[in-house]
Regions:
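Hydrophobic beta-strand segments that make up the repeating blades of beta-propeller
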Residues: 74, 118-125, 170-177, 224-228, ...
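Beta-rich catalytic cores
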Residues: 104, 128, 156, 180, ...
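Beta-propeller blade termini
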Residues: 105-115, 134, 157-170, 186, ...
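Structural signal for beta-propeller blades
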Residues: 129-132, 181-184, 233, 262-264, ...
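Long hydrophobic segments that form regular secondary structure
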Residues: 401-411, 416-436, 440, 501-505, ...
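Bacterial N-terminal signal peptides
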Residues: 8-17
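Blade-edge motifs of beta-propeller repeat domains
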Residues: 25-103, 134-155, 186-206, 237-286, ...
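Gly/Ser/Thr/Pro-enriched helix-cap/hinge segments flanking short amphipathic alpha-helices
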Residues: 23, 72, 91, 95, ...
Length: 644
């Protein structure tokens, strides 16, 4: 398969998808098919697939570089889980392929919606409705979407976030959409939800994307931040109910009139919110796909970092819950140009929030081949298209390491976190050794080649080492998925756009097969077995449910911590938790945020490595209260800490 840049410096967008007859997923010609069955057409010369055996062998040969435990494995247990969800992409990125932002996919979120101690999964979808799957225990799930009332089948959904909006002890749900109106659902505590969007006044109609809850003014009620990408659609409706994308959608960043700025809603209590964006001076520019929060300057107030899908990101400092001030130049003089995923976490166990950002769009400038996927992108676009000097940007992932003086050093290449076509990522201690690891969901699907998901093991803060083949995340069980069916003999669109290369030399019905790819992910202990598992939301395909066998391979020690605020918000969003054990000090933040459109951070999980005991646990609450526990806890259990 030959691919060309999604964006072009010239005035046209060029895409190509080249096939070679009916093929198997290995690239070899298949035997003749029945005349009554559609031909399956796989991309030809897919270097992403062809290189998998060699990449696996090469990675396994590097095992001796790992100082941490790696002799465990992830297995995709989708079938055993009972989950039958399938992501359905809208027509804009399938049969009538257009280069627009619909190909960015949707998120996934986790919460215990019914209070039974098991974490349930909410899959976000474009066409056909979202789905809520109840955790039955032992790795099994049941679809409860209908009785829960959270399907939203007639909207194009994008992101999701759970939070206890009214401090009732039950996680409520917020979902963003593309021009369908965002939705807030109230949870009755038993996993049944009621749409309270109208009274909450949060039903913005826009091209919304990521969202998260946080208490920006520390009044004990969680507020809501919503990112909006910008106008990339026309008023024409497609067959899936979506608004058809603009032909120059990826030039939208050059049209300020198309911008749709982020919105900050202040929680007034009792499911009522107020738009205070202008009041607090928040006005970041650009196409914001997602954002996250952390107390970057250590003054006790949560700040915000906004991603820009095409251009410079921005950091806004919280001044006492009254105003936000743009401090980007002071802290982050260069940022990724095509940012997609974001997460604050302490990768070096130094007690300070470091920042990882994935950059997918820079990888669309040109295809480097698999040997160069760990390098920054060689940008071919003009500076007029970039809307800035090349020297102003980082063209790839960025890992900002916070130093003792509060400044940040960009160390992505030094730390080995560059990946290819990355979307969202999730962070968690996958081998329970006290060092947070990274799972990166990636790939581009039709009409591009196969791209791998990445799993980066934290080598004790010294470097992240590629481990997706070592640990069984790659290669996938199924490398391709059906994308769309077309009748090459009768369909009037058969020789239009990418369909022309699909139907070239063919007659009758043809199914175009696409490389599989992931857009978002969550990390949590889905079976309460003590080890962290991974669930993905794959684009136009089924999810992957990666179950870890770590607990069966070695004796592991861990503690999970859930917070109960009193003066602070009920879930303790914004709290800082420090666990000291075995000479290692781990710091995590209750931010309720995963890497892209998603959420997987409740409860906090601390791997304890070989520590014989936990020495102390310290909680810094959003209210300003500090709490130190030096007894009353044990390993391998869930600990609930209530604010004094």
């Amino acid at each position: 398969m030959k691919t060309f840049p999604l964006f072009a410096a010239a005035s046209a967008i060029i895409l190509s998808f080249v096939f070679a007859g009916a093929q198997t997923h290995s690239g070899k010609s298949s035997s003749p098919q029945s005349v009554n069955k559609p031909h399956l057409r796989y991309p030809d010369d897919d270097i992403g697939v062809d290189s998998l055996p060699a990449r696996k062998a090469a990675q396994i040969a590097t095992e001796n570089q790992l100082k941490v435990f790696y002799r465990f494995h992830f297995t995709d247990r989708l079938k055993e889980s009972g989950i039958t969800f399938k992501y359905h992409a809208v027509d804009d990125v399938t049969r009538h392929f257009r280069a627009d932002h619909y190909d960015h996919g949707s998120g996934i979120a986790v919460a215990d919606v019914d209070g039974d101690g098991l974490y349930d999964i909410y899959f976000v979808n474009q066409a056909g409705g979202n789905e809520l799957w109840k955790n039955l225990g032992n790795g099994r799930f049941k679809n409860i979407t209908k009785e829960a009332g959270v399907g939203m089948p007639r909207r194009i959904s994008v992101g999701a976030a759970f939070a206890d909006v009214n401090n009732s002890g039950h996680p409520d749900l917020f979902v963003t959409t593309v021009r369908g109106g965002n939705v807030l659902f109230k949870n009755d505590g038993h996993g049944h939800f009621t749409d309270v969007t109208k009274e909450a006044a949060v039903g913005l109609v826009a091209h919304s994307s990521g969202a998260f809850f946080f208490d920006f003014d520390k009044d004990g009620l969680v507020d809501l931040l919503v990112c909006n990408v910008g106008n990339y659609t026309t008023d024409e409706k497609g067959p899936d109910g979506e608004y058809v994308g603009l032909k120059d959608g990826f030039y939208g960043h050059l049209h300020p009139d198309r911008f749709e700025h982020p919105v900050l809603y202040k929680n007034l209590g009792n499911y009522h919110f107020k738009d205070v964006t202008a009041e607090v001076g928040l006005r970041p520019h650009g196409w914001c796909g997602d954002a996250s929060t952390a107390d970057i300057n250590g003054d006790g107030w949560p700040d915000i970092y906004f991603l820009n899908m095409q251009g410079s990101n921005s950091y806004w400092e919280n001044e006492g819950g009254k105003k936000f001030v743009d401090k980007t130049a002071e802290y982050f003089p260069r940022t990724p140009w095509g940012a997609m995923g974001i997460k604050f976490f302490d990768y070096a166990d130094e007690g300070r929030p470091d920042l990882l950002i994935t950059d997918m769009h820079s990888d669309m400038s040109q295809e480097p081949g698999v040997d160069n996927e760990k390098k920054k992108s060689d940008i071919t676009w003009t500076e007029s298209y970039l809307a800035g000097k090349k020297s102003d940007f980082i063209f790839g992932n960025a890992l900002f390491h916070q130093l003792a003086d509060g400044k940040f050093e960009e160390v992505s290449d030094k730390m080995g976190v560059e990946t290819y076509w990355p979307w969202g990522f999730s962070v968690g201690d996958l081998n329970a050794d006290g060092w947070d690891d990274i799972f990166v969901s990636a790939g581009m699907s039709f009409p591009y080649r196969y791209g791998i998901n990445s799993l980066l093991l934290n080598n004790r803060g010294e470097k992240f080492l590629d481990s997706e083949f070592i640990l069984g995340v790659e290669p996938r069980k199924n490398l391709y998925t059906p994308w769309f069916e077309i009748d090459c003999s009768r369909d009037p669109d058969a020789m239009q756009g990418v369909n022309q290369s699909v139907c070239d030399g063919q007659s009758g019905k043809v199914i175009a097969m696409s490389p599989r790819s992931s857009r978002s992910s969550v990390i949590f202990d889905l079976d309460n077995g003590g080890a962290l598992d991974i669930v993905t939301n794959d684009f136009n395909s089924e999810p992957q449910v990666f179950v870890s066998d770590l607990a069966q391979r070695k004796k592991i020690r861990w503690i999970k911590i859930v917070l109960a605020g009193t003066a602070s918000n009920r879930e303790g969003l914004g709290a800082r938790v420090v666990v000291r054990a075995g000479g290692l000090t781990q710091t995590k933040w209750m931010d309720g945020k995963s890497g892209y459109l998603s959420q997987s951070d409740l409860p906090l999980y601390f791997g304890l490595g070989d520590a014989a005991k936990i020495d102390s646990i310290e909680v810094s609450w959003p209210s300003g209260r500090k709490q130190v526990l030096d007894s009353g806890f044990a390993e391998n259990r869930l600990l609930k800490i209530t604010e004094p």
